[in-house]
């Protein structure tokens, strides 16, 4: 990744500082405990970015996902944003009708789901509901499959072939779309640029005096505004 002022560039900067520093730790309670270094995270993001590039989506296209907090979630977001696409993470517990609304609202051509969703094996009801909604709208359903420090995007036609032909994001490009809760009406999309996210992250770092030696414990769902 380059030194561009976009969200994924933070990890490139940290990677050059210390490639073997731990970036993500998944505890045993996560189901598949593991530790991922910044170097390994960068490699995974490059892998998924190259596969997304093979889809040849125009810059600014929204790519939805329905994933729980996981390594896959983090990599999909970073790869999508780095490519100049827009990540739109959905609550993995949404009902089919709710997923339908968000797919239609974002006009996404693709929905990324957990491994096992296409076959229906070892898939949550939320993942299956997301697939049904996507199928009804002819939205491409793609699994994100982890194995031996690799991540593969797989749909009904097989695995995506990596491509080097790709666009790049800038700080004023939208990186993320979140939706309001809709408690007083229909949920509304809230676009956040790379610059918005970087500013927020910088403020959090200053507020809590965070340093490279600190570790944060994530308990909130990544798809939510926080």
Where are these regions (language model features)?
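Short beta-strand->loop structural element characteristic of the AMP-binding/adenylate-forming
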Residues: 64-66, 73, 77, 81-112, ...
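Conserved ATP-dependent adenylate/AMP-binding module captured primarily in the ANL superfamily
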Residues: 94-129, 200-217
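Conserved AMP-binding/adenylate-forming core of the ANL superfamily
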Residues: 23-78, 95-100, 168, 192-194
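Conserved AMP-binding A3 loop
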Residues: 35-39, 168, 175-202
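Conserved structural elements of the adenylate-forming
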Residues: 42-47, 171, 190-211, 216-220
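ANL superfamily adenylate-forming
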Residues: 30, 34, 116-171
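A short N-terminal helical cap/helix-turn-helix that marks the beginning
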Residues: 2-25, 43
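Conserved pre-ATP/AMP-binding loop-to-beta segment of ANL
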Residues: 19-22, 159-179, 185-186, 209-215
């Amino acid at each position: 990744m380059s030194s561009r002022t976009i969200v994924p560039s933070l990890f490139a900067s940290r990677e050059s500082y210390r490639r073997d520093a731990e970036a993500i730790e998944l505890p045993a309670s996560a189901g598949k405990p593991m530790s991922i270094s910044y170097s390994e995270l960068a490699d995974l993001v490059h892998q998924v970015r190259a596969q997304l590039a093979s889809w040849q989506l125009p810059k600014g296209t929204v790519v939805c996902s329905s994933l729980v907090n996981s390594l896959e979630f983090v990599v999909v977001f970073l790869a999508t944003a780095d490519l100049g696409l827009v990540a739109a993470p959905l609550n993995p517990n949404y009902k089919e009708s709710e997923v339908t609304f968000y797919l239609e609202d974002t006009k996404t051509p693709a929905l990324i789901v957990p491994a096992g969703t296409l076959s229906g094996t070892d898939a949550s009801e939320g993942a299956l509901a997301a697939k049904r909604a996507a199928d009804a709208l002819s939205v491409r359903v793609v699994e994100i499959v982890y194995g031996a420090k690799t991540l593969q995007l797989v749909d009904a036609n097989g695995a995506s072939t990596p491509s080097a032909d790709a666009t790049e994001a800038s700080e004023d490009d939208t990186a993320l779309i979140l939706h309001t809760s809709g408690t007083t009406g229909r949920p509304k999309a809230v676009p956040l640029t790379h610059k918005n996210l970087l500013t927020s992250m910088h403020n959090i770092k200053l507020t809590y005096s965070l340093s490279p030696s600190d570790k944060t414990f994530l308990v909130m769902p990544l798809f939510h505004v926080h």
